[in-house]
């Protein structure tokens, strides 16, 4: 009897390796589809994957074939249309497609290949190459510290970490599985031999045959190794990062009367995308939500996105509150401070210089990165130009961009938060 032992480490997902290879091969198609989905779907609608379609012509495998020309002697069935030396016309056809049209009676094509990517894969492509810039470590001058923690049992490892009990248990189970039928037959043969010796002691032929069978079964059982490499089990130890830096992200949003509902919706989407990014990439990060009109308040996530409160426009109120929270809870000696501000650019005229002064003297010297997005199709106003002066003084830690429609959110988001090397 033959035994087939499946020793693949990912037995429950036997196509995982093939799927990962496929995703790497068609990365460009998938990234393009994900970017289109992000601009099309609501930012809050990120809890599922996406249907990806790849044109049939792009999944064709390269093949070797005979080129045109040369001489070949081939026997074909007779016909009434062609004579010696004539070229056979290529059949009509084309790639498959979607959309309205009339049915045809000739030609053939190939439909698009469609498949579903998971939410995890969708977010992985969406946030690829994104990282909070200039994340530096505080209170340590060296590299990150790690702590070693137990992480279960592994089939591979250092001999010094072998788990003897798990190894012997696995070996015992394997021996039972591989020699179980032989042991059962051995017990039957032994019982039969004892019966014959007791009842028919002169039946030497059967006694000899049973003794030969018993010797064969014992030899077969002995051939099952006591310990196999597959039985070896090791204590798995992994290095778990011991965070040596703490980060806080301030989210400032204008909810004044000058912000239309469409503008507020774009601002909300930008911050929801930012919030998803932070929660996915940074487990140890605080997020502070500040809404402002003529006055500013620190609110929770629910109120930040969905409250209907509105009013006039004094942007400096949010900056003052941010500075107070920084001083009270997030000293720059212990925290990496980041901020993102969204507004339509409208502000009380005398307040814009105050905003620049607060940012220049009380905020920018203490933050790692500050980004401002202005959501408007109109010409920029005083606040934008005051912020441009800040960008001249803090080119490495300040950035500003303009949003016009919801479709601009993702490209602007990538541009603001694309990965940068720490100098």
UniProtKB/Swiss-Prot annotation:
Residues 93-107 have a biased composition (Gly residues). It comes from the Bacteria. Transmembrane segments: none annotated. Pfam families: DUF444. InterPro entries: UPF0229, vWFA_dom_sf. Residues 65-110 are annotated as: Disordered. Belongs to the UPF0229 family. HAMAP family: UPF0229 (MF_01232). This is UPF0229 protein PSPTO_0546. It comes from Pseudomonas syringae pv. tomato (strain ATCC BAA-871 / DC3000).
